[in-house]
């Protein structure tokens, strides 16, 4: 069976293949002759980034895992200034990180096509909010393309580069969790010769200070030019191949469906058995093409806009209709929820209310049954993997700092430390926020060591911030510099599992690896020492006792302490071992030694360990044990031992 990375590079125009939405976008970028791709991984965009990393060398594309989205944006933007086709990708909250450069550079335009792929996450399946990128785009006056299928995602990617070059303007390709992760038929197009031969493309930057030096005197002229340009793009989108009107021409009711909502609307109409309706399928939620609106509204008596999250299309349509003097009812967020993702059910309920119909399914009855079943089925909360080094780090931190300590944390697998029995996460906000929050708490409760009023000699509030290795490089560095500079009193534990694990095992500056070979590794402890941290140490969390003792020592220091807890991600390590046919030790419980104290369950919480109610002893599920030996270290009665060959 062919790998996805092979399929994405197939030179088979016309071949129909099954691809994920993100994989289809990667193929589209290659068909568009992309030269530079830079991104920071973030679900639900990561598959695009990883696919580009896998094919970059073979396709002659420069690809990098940037340290954060702002840097990725700037890297790709500079390539586009140099006349190359460039792309950056990020999840929706990543655009917050890139926003400073994004909003400040829109007016400068581009030379080569520049596409910003942003993957939104309605319902927050893997995110801390469900912000709508289309609102950002409207604010910045950047056009948005939004696909309704994987094939359309591929074709839209190519069109986005063409649109960007035609107007020398940024273009956002907006997906959602469902469109990024949906699979569907994709018809392959022609690959450019440079991609097929793997010929690397190089650009040329032409100096123009009045354009690229964003001082007020230069920037002042940009705003009117941006507004003029977006209206020209609006006019262009009247002929966009991803916008069309379908259904009965003489219908009295109409539905506007942008992006993936179009697929839900089509399915909902089939459920309801409704055919006497006109549909405006929008692939460009911003700016909405007004010429197409005029054709669509002709003869209609009422309209429903079905869109996820914010009323971006609705506001544009209502403004246009008001200016045109149209006084027909236009419904949107009064019938379609403003929160969480679109579903077929939501589309059915909204359209049924709009048309005064009964839903074909009794959803209330289904909800009632679901509630009853939910009470019977035992909950299965997420947990850290067996052998996860973060569990050992948290166990040692909790033991050393105690339950009264405050534990700001960050975005990563380790956020699961909030759950029992570890309970060593008290706050999470955004990437890198653990150190800033930890510093703020320390200043608020302990004061700064630079202050005369510092609570010297008094019992200090212990604050232990935890942050991952990739997150440390992403946005942890400025916060660490700030804490050291302002003489904070906080312990920062960097949970270094030598990979960007949660988003798919991508490399980062701490690993030194890049898609093009070995870069330069930047050890976290060297950075902390260079910044002037008052205490720096490196521990192996698989040695719980040594980790505990080091953390106790760090807590005694007045100032900023940094402990790097370094051990490779267990899931990544086991995957590598499986591919190489290697084995790992499996632990079991010696029943005669087990007293049933439950420390291994109630304090440590490895998912491979469970309670046997018959023997009243702990047991290890051998299919889940990955042999880290943490259980043997936390058990006070030495009841855990590695199984011998043949047991």
Curated annotation (Swiss-Prot):
Residues that hold [4Fe-4S] cluster 2 according to the record: 606, 625, 628, 631
Cofactor: binding comment: Binds 2 [4Fe-4S] clusters. In this family the first cluster has a non-standard and varying [4Fe-4S] binding motif CX(2)CX(2)CX(4-5)CP.
Temperature dependence: Optimum temperature is 70 degrees Celsius.
Domain of life: Archaea
GO biological process annotation, one example: sulfur compound biosynthetic process
Protein's UniProt keywords contain Iron: yes
Protein residues bound to [4Fe-4S] cluster 1: 594, 597, 600, 635
UniProt keywords, alphabetically: 4Fe-4S, Electron transport, Iron, Iron-sulfur, Metal-binding, Oxidoreductase, Repeat, Transport
Cofactor: [4Fe-4S] cluster
Pfam family, one: POR_N
Family matches, as CDD domains: TPP_IOR_alpha, TPP_PYR_PFOR_IOR-alpha_like
MF-aspect GO terms: 4 iron, 4 sulfur cluster binding; indolepyruvate ferredoxin oxidoreductase activity; metal ion binding; thiamine pyrophosphate binding
Oligomeric and partner information: Heterodimer of the IorA and IorB subunits.
Protein task: Catalyzes the ferredoxin-dependent oxidative decarboxylation of arylpyruvates.
Protein name, entry field: Indolepyruvate oxidoreductase subunit IorA
């Amino acid at each position: 069976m062919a790998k996805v990375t092979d399929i994405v590079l197939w030179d088979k125009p016309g071949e129909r293949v099954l691809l994920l939405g993100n994989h289809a976008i990667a193929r589209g970028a290659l068909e568009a002759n992309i030269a530079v791709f830079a991104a920071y991984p973030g679900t639900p965009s990561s598959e695009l980034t990883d696919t580009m990393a896998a094919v970059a060398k073979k396709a002659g594309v420069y690809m990098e895992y940037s340290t954060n989205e702002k840097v990725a944006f700037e890297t790709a933007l500079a390539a586009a200034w140099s006349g190359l086709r460039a792309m950056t990708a990020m999840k929706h909250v990543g655009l917050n990180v890139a926003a400073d450069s994004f909003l400040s550079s829109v007016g400068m335009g581009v030379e080569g096509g520049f596409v910003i792929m942003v993957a939104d996450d309605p319902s927050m399946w893997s995110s801390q909010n469900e912000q709508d990128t289309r609102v950002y785009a409207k604010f910045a006056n950047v056009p948005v393309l939004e696909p309704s299928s994987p094939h359309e995602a591929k074709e839209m990617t190519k069109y986005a580069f063409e649109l960007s070059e035609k107007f020398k303007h940024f273009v956002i390709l907006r997906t959602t969790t469902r469109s990024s992760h949906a699979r569907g038929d994709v018809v392959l197009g022609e690959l450019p010769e440079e991609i097929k031969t793997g010929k690397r493309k190089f650009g040329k930057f032409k100096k123009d200070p009045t354009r690229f030096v964003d001082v007020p005197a230069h920037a002042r002229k940009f705003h009117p030019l941006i507004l003029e340009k977006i209206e020209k793009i609006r006019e262009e989108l009247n002929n966009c191949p991803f916008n069309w009107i379908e259904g009965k021409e003489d219908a009295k009711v109409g539905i506007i469906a942008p992006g993936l909502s179009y697929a839900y609307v089509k399915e909902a109409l089939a459920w309801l058995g409704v055919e006497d309706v006109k549909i405006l399928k929008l692939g460009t939620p911003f700016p909405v093409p007004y010429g197409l609106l005029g054709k669509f509204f002709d003869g209609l008596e009422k309209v429903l806009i079905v869109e996820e999250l914010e009323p971006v299309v609705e506001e544009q349509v209502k403004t246009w209709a008001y200016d045109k003097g149209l006084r027909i009812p236009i419904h949107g967020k009064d019938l379609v929820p403003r929160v969480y993702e679109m579903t077929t059910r939501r589309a059915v309920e909204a359209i049924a209310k709009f048309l005064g119909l009964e839903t074909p399914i009794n959803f209330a009855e289904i909800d009632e049954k679901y509630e009853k079943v939910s009470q019977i089925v035992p909950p299965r909360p997420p947990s850290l993997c067996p052998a996860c080094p973060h569990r050992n780090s948290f166990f040692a931190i909790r033991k050393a700092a105690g339950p009264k300590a405050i534990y700001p944390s960050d975005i990563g697998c380790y956020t699961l430390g909030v759950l029992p029995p570890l309970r060593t996460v008290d706050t999470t906000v955004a990437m890198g926020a653990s150190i800033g929050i930890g510093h703020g708490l320390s200043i608020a409760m302990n004061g700064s060591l630079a202050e005369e009023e510092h609570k010297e000699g008094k019992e200090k509030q212990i604050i232990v911030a935890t942050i991952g290795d990739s997150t440390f490089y992403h946005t942890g560095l400025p916060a660490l510099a700030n804490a050291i500079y302002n003489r904070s009193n906080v312990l920062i534990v960097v949970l270094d599992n030598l990979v960007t694990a949660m988003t798919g095992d991508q490399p980062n500056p701490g690993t030194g690896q890049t898609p093009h070979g070995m870069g330069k590794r930047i050890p976290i402890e060297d950075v902390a020492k260079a910044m002037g941290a008052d205490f720096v140490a490196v521990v192996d969390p698989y040695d719980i006792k040594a980790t505990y003792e080091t953390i106790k020592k760090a807590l005694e220091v007045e100032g900023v302490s940094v402990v790097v807890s370094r051990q490779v991600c267990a899931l990544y390590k086991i995957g590598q071992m499986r591919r190489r046919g290697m084995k790992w030790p499996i632990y079991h419980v010696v029943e005669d030694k087990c007293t049933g104290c439950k420390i291994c369950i109630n304090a440590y919480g490895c998912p491979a360990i469970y309670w046997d109610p018959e023997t009243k002893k702990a047991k290890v599920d051998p299919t889940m044990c990955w042999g880290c030996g943490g259980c043997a270290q936390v058990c006070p009665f030495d009841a855990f031992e590695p199984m011998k060959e043949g047991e």
